[in-house]
């Protein structure tokens, strides 16, 4: 009897582990999940246009809200151009991916770093417009280039932060020859 119970327990344990593996194995898209909220440590997703990745995102929590994707907790976003070359990294507390346009907003302790030149932007909110490949913020920003920094309100830039503008600057910064 004891041997039978041991075998039964072992069988149930192995069966439940196998079922859990099957559940996780076939999830290739967020649409494969039934729940509106997915938590993980971390969740990794890619958003593509055709065969090219637009964004590669890491986050602690993903929430589907009326077709848009809400991301919470330690959001890291790699942004790519149409050739698949990384243009920048964006880090924030939370973000929203607008699925109709593939544009994105990042909120809370936002830092954007250009992969092209290492320039950094700090603010509380930015919007990444995928169709025009522009970055915008209406908030106060701190832009850091090499050893220079400039504060201001309002910011426009291309994705790789080569061509940028602060709408209402506070202070001075020297632009390089290629900017």
Residue ranges and their predicted role:
Residues 1-179:
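Mature-chain termini and adjacent capping regions
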């Amino acid at each position: 009897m004891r041997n039978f119970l041991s075998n039964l327990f072992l069988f149930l344990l192995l069966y439940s582990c196998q079922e859990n593996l099957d559940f996780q194995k076939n999830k290739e898209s967020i649409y494969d999940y039934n729940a509106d909220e997915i938590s993980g440590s971390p969740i990794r997703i890619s958003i593509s246009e055709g065969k090219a990745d637009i964004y590669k995102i890491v986050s602690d929590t993903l929430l589907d809200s009326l077709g848009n994707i809400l991301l919470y907790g330690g959001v890291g976003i790699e942004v790519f151009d149409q050739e698949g070359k990384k243009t920048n990294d964006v880090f924030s507390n939370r973000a929203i991916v607008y699925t109709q346009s593939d544009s994105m907003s990042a909120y809370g302790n936002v830092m954007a770093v250009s992969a092209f030149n290492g320039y950094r932007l700090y603010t509380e909110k930015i919007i990444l417009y995928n169709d025009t490949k522009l970055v915008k913020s209406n908030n106060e920003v701190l832009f850091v280039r090499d050893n220079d920094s400039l504060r201001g309100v309002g910011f426009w830039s291309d994705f790789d932060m080569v061509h940028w503008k602060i709408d209402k600057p506070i202070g001075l910064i020297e632009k390089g020859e290629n900017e």
